[in-house]
């Protein structure tokens, strides 16, 4: 961290996650991981934060862990995966958890994982190459089209990898949630979800969310993202150890997408607004 100029690192758990297995064992492993990251924070004051894990498909266990992680361990937020087997994040089963997170005005970070639907479907192509971006996009769509982000407006969402493929399918997000009036014709949302679930439209919901730069500093990806959302919604992320902070910083400074003021906001300022206790 010192070599790369990283002042604070926010820790979270990546694949394969915790959702599978016997309920009590899952709760135990989740608790151990959260307590480990809390110890890292206490051992290195001011250098580490954490997005705590929860067993989200176990409602009782999830609610207990939210209380423990945020109240006792003082975690900075909650870390989720883009799907849990065949459940994406807009699923109605998760409503009790979202009600509590919204009440707490929690920060929720989402990292992708491959869904049951889509493992090893293209020969010689690792799931991380295509499916992580696709699954991030699926779960963003699930949250918006289900009306979840509308019902729980006080939750702050952060998605990894520049939102996956979302910037490139933005036209479909918009046309699927907004009412377009053509002479004599009213076109409603293209999906099974009526526009009234998303009364302000998909673009409004997308622009409330935050997106990190992990493995997405390529100029094509960054230009696409900043076309959809303002720079204020982009935060620094590395995917360490899969990608180093040095590589990420080099990508951001050489892609010629952002000026110096915008880079300062991405590198620190925007995150400080979400997590004010780390303000310099």
Each predicted region: which residue ranges?
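Short glycine-enriched loops at secondary-structure junctions
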Residues: 56, 112-116, 240-242
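Mid-domain alpha/beta scaffold segments of enzyme catalytic cores
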Residues: 1-84, 92-93
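Catalytic pocket-lining loop regions of alpha/beta-barrel enzymes
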Residues: 70-233
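Short catalytic/ligand-binding loop motif for oxyanion handling, primarily in non-cytosolic enzymes
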Residues: 10, 17-22, 59-62, 69, ...
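Short beta-strand segments
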Residues: 10-12, 53, 159-161, 210-213, ...
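Residue-level preference for long, well-ordered alpha-helices that form the structural scaffold
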Residues: 26-33, 58, 90, 133, ...
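Mid-to-C-terminal alpha-helical segments outside catalytic/metal-binding sites
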Residues: 1-8, 35-42, 64-68, 76, ...
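Short glycine-enriched, charge-decorated loop/helix-capping segments at active-site entrances
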Residues: 23-27, 127, 251-254
């Amino acid at each position: 961290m010192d070599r790369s100029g990283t002042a604070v690192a926010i820790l979270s758990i990546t694949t394969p996650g915790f959702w599978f297995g016997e309920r009590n064992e899952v709760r135990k492993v989740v608790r151990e991981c959260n307590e480990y990251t809390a110890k890292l924070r206490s051992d290195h004051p001011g250098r580490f934060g954490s997005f705590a894990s929860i067993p989200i498909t176990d409602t009782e266990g999830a609610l207990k862990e939210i209380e423990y992680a945020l109240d006792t361990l003082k975690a900075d937020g909650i870390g989720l995966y883009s799907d849990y087997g065949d459940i994406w994040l807009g699923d109605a089963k998760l409503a009790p958890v979202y009600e509590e997170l919204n009440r707490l005005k929690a920060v929720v970070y989402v990292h992708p994982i491959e869904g049951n639907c889509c493992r090893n479907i293209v020969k010689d192509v690792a799931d991380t190459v295509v499916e992580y971006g696709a699954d991030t996009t699926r779960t963003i769509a699930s949250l918006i089209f289900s009306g979840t982000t509308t019902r729980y407006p006080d939750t702050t969402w952060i998605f990894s990898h520049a939102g996956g493929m979302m910037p490139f399918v933005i036209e479909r997000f918009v046309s699927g949630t907004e009412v377009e009036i053509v002479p004599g014709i009213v076109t409603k949302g293209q999906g099974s979800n009526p526009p009234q679930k998303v009364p302000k439209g998909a673009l409004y919901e997308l622009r409330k969310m935050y997106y990190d730069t992990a493995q997405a500093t390529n100029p094509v990806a960054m230009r696409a993202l900043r076309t959809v959302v303002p720079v204020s919604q982009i935060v620094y992320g590395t995917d360490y150890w899969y990608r180093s902070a040095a590589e990420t910083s080099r990508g951001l400074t050489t892609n010629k997408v952002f000026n110096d003021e915008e880079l300062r906001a991405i590198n620190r300022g925007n995150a400080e607004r979400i997590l004010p206790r780390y303000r310099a």
